[in-house]
C-alpha cells in the first residue's frame, strides 16, 4: 500500500491518501495537546502505543459486531483504514463522573453514575467543541435525520457494553471516552478515529491510579509508562 499525499494534520495524527481511493493511512504522532491545544508537549513512542492499542480494540469491536474503519496496522505508527465522510460530532460516553462533568454540574469526582451517560459535542476546535443537543445537530446539518443521532447513541452504548467489562477484566475502570463516527462509501455509519488513552480515561481498579492523558493534563508525569501498562494489560490473555 503506497502512502501518498498529506490530506490533513490534526493534533494527534496525520492523514494520507493511498493508491486506493477507498483507503487512507493515519500516522500516529507523538504530540500531546490538552485544553483545546493550549497545553502542548510530546512523548517519544506515544503514537506507536496508541496505534497498537487502537488496533487491538478495533479488532475486538469488529469481532463483537461493531463496524469500524479499521483495515490493518501497517507498522508501529501507521494504520490503514477505510475512507469515510466524517460526522462532526464527538460522542462522549461516561460511566464515572470526572473532568468537565464534575466541574460543570457539581457532581463529586469519582461518582459512579446510575446509568451510562451519552453526550454530543460539536467537533469544532475554533468554537471549543461545545455541547450539542439533537436539535443543534440537525440545525447545523451535522446529520440529516434524527435516526442517525439515535444510531450514534445506540452504537456508543453497544461499544461501552463491550469495552467496560473487557477493561474491568484487565483491572481498569473505563471512566469515560470519546468516539468519532463517519459514513462509508455505502452510507453506513461506522466507528472511526482511534480508541486509546488519548481519548479514554482509565483508572486502575485497585489503586485508582490514572492511566491516560490526564497524566499530561494534570502534570502527573509517567504518561508513557501508563500507556505501556494499558497495552500490556490488553495483550495479556
Curated annotation (Swiss-Prot):
Give the pathway. Answer: Purine metabolism; IMP biosynthesis via de novo pathway; 5-amino-1-(5-phospho-D-ribosyl)imidazole-4-carboxamide from 5-amino-1-(5-phospho-D-ribosyl)imidazole-4-carboxylate: step 1/2
Q: Which InterPro entries match?
A: SAICAR_synt/ADE2_N, SAICAR_synt_PurC, SAICAR_synth, SAICAR_synthetase, SAICAR_synthetase_CS
Q: Name one GO biological process term.
A: cobalamin biosynthetic process
Q: Show the catalytic activity.
A: 5-amino-1-(5-phospho-D-ribosyl)imidazole-4-carboxylate + L-aspartate + ATP = (2S)-2-[5-amino-1-(5-phospho-beta-D-ribosyl)imidazole-4-carboxamido]succinate + ADP + phosphate + 2 H(+)
Q: Which GO terms describe its molecular function?
A: ATP binding; phosphoribosylaminoimidazolesuccinocarboxamide synthase activity
Say which domain of life the source belongs to. Bacteria
UniProt keyword annotations, A-Z: ATP-binding, Ligase, Nucleotide-binding, Purine biosynthesis
Q: Which Pfam families is this protein grouped with?
A: SAICAR_synt
EC assignment: 6.3.2.6
Instruction: Return the similarity comment.
Output: Belongs to the SAICAR synthetase family.
Q: Which HAMAP family match?
A: SAICAR_synth (MF_00137)
Q: Which PANTHER family match?
A: MULTIFUNCTIONAL PROTEIN ADE2, SI:DKEY-6E2.2
Its recorded name reads Phosphoribosylaminoimidazole-succinocarboxamide synthase
Q: What is the lineage of its organism?
A: Bacteria, Pseudomonadati, Campylobacterota, Epsilonproteobacteria, Campylobacterales
Amino acid at each position: 500500500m503506497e502512502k501518498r499525499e498529506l490530506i490533513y494534520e490534526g493534533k494527534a495524527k496525520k492523514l494520507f491518501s493511498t493508491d486506493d481511493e477507498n483507503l487512507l493511512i493515519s500516522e500516529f504522532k507523538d504530540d500531546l495537546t490538552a485544553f483545546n491545544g493550549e497545553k502542548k508537549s510530546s512523548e517519544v513512542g506515544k503514537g506507536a502505543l496508541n496505534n497498537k492499542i487502537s488496533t487491538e480494540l478495533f479488532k475486538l469491536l469488529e469481532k463483537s459486531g461493531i463496524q469500524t474503519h479499521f483495515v490493518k496496522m501497517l507498522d508501529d505508527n501507521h494504520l490503514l483504514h477505510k475512507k469515510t465522510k466524517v460526522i462532526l460530532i464527538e460522542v462522549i460516553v461516561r460511566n464515572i463522573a470526572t473532568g468537565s462533568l464534575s466541574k460543570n454540574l457539581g457532581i463529586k469526582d469519582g461518582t459512579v453514575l446510575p446509568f451510562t451517560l451519552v453526550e454530543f459535542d460539536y467537533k469544532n476546535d475554533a468554537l471549543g467543541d461545545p455541547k450539542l443537543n439533537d436539535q443543534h445537530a440537525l440545525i447545523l446539518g451535522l446529520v440529516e435525520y434524527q435516526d442517525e443521532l439515535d444510531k450514534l447513541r445506540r452504537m456508543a452504548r453497544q461499544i461501552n457494553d463491550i469495552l467496560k467489562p473487557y477493561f474491568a477484566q484487565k483491572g481498569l475502570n473505563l471512566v469515560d471516552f470519546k468516539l468519532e463516527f463517519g459514513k462509508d462509501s455505502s452510507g453506513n455509519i461506522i466507528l472511526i478515529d482511534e480508541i486509546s488513552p488519548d481519548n479514554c480515561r482509565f483508572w486502575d481498579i485497585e489503586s485508582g491510579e490514572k492511566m491516560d492523558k490526564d497524566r499530561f493534563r494534570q502534570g502527573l508525569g509517567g504518561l508513557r509508562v501508563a500507556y505501556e501498562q494499558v497495552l500490556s494489560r490488553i495483550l495479556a490473555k
